């Protein structure tokens, strides 16, 4: 039986070669075997974010939001969680929620958090700020 760390490492390796469904399977299995106790909260948040991010890459925004919202519950100040959650909300036409989360990410990291992301997200937050 693989450990949580082994499953997460395997998931990351699969992501690097574009095998998103396989990576998702690894991350979900890791989440299943991670205890739901305070001692494992950081690990659970990391895995929830990995699942949400993978689903985002697969353009499964609604499913991604489910996992990212769970991660957000534990770590609402995390800029990356706010970024991904806001992106998914924007893609799902949840504009007010998207504005809140993208703005939190932007306020924490500035425009650098949007580097490597589709330019439409930075443009969206700038547009949303003006309105």
Model-derived regions: residue spans:
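TPR/TPR-like (Sel1-like) alpha-helical repeat modules
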Residues: 27-32, 89-113
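Alpha-helical linker/edge segments of TPR/alpha-solenoid repeat scaffolds
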Residues: 50-60, 91-101, 123-131
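Alpha-helical adaptor scaffolds
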Residues: 16, 20-21, 28-74
């Amino acid at each position: 039986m693989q450990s949580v760390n082994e499953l997460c490492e395997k998931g990351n390796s699969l992501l690097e070669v574009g095998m998103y469904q396989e990576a998702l399977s690894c991350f979900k299995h890791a989440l299943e075997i991670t205890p739901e106790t305070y001692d494992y909260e950081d690990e659970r948040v990391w895995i929830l974010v990995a699942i949400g991010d993978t689903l985002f890459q697969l353009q499964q925004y609604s499913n991604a939001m489910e996992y990212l919202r769970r991660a957000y519950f534990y770590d609402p100040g995390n800029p990356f969680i706010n970024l991904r959650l806001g992106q998914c909300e924007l893609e799902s036409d949840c504009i007010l929620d998207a504005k809140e989360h993208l703005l939190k990410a932007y306020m924490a990291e500035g425009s650098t958090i949007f580097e490597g992301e589709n330019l439409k997200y930075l443009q969206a937050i700038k547009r949303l700020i003006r309105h």
